[in-house]
């Protein structure tokens, strides 16, 4: 492994540690939550459509999502390791036999539909994804509880220190009189 591949692997691991993306492939309907900056405000916008391609590898990997918006086909390319991509949710798994679904650009209506994959692999992926989401929520909740307990302990220590200081001040006043 040369130095560039090593650096890319380190960066990909660092980004993957912050957020986990589910396993998805072309044909799957995905909801991509993207951070949008408007002036000095930031908000998260959901972009839902069919993943029609995954390309590249390593840190340069990207995927293309196509949706029909007000009768017009809109495609958007998202880098997998972009900091602007908050999360990706798989809405449904599609059953396709191609890696690139560019033929959907020429199709309209029912002919552009993709059959839902209900096989065992898709079921396992969905179950694993749900389990990962539950574990992530439990971990976040545990962190919140730990932070709340630490804050309560900190407040109690501060109040005890204040009470002790007030007690010492009263003792000093009594000694001065």
UniProtKB/Swiss-Prot annotation:
Belongs to the bacterial ribosomal protein bL19 family. InterPro entries: Ribosomal_bL19, Ribosomal_bL19_CS, Ribosomal_bL19_sf, Translation_prot_SH3-like_sf. This protein is located at the 30S-50S ribosomal subunit interface and may play a role in the structure and function of the aminoacyl-tRNA binding site. This is Large ribosomal subunit protein bL19. The lineage of its organism: Bacteria, Pseudomonadati, Pseudomonadota, Alphaproteobacteria, Hyphomicrobiales. HAMAP family: Ribosomal_bL19 (MF_00402). It comes from Rhizobium meliloti (strain 1021) (Ensifer meliloti). Keywords: Ribonucleoprotein, Ribosomal protein. One of its GO terms (molecular function) is structural constituent of ribosome. GO terms for biological process: translation. NCBIfam families: rplS_bact (TIGR01024). GO terms for cellular component: cytosolic large ribosomal subunit. The gene is rplS. The keyword Ribosomal protein applies.
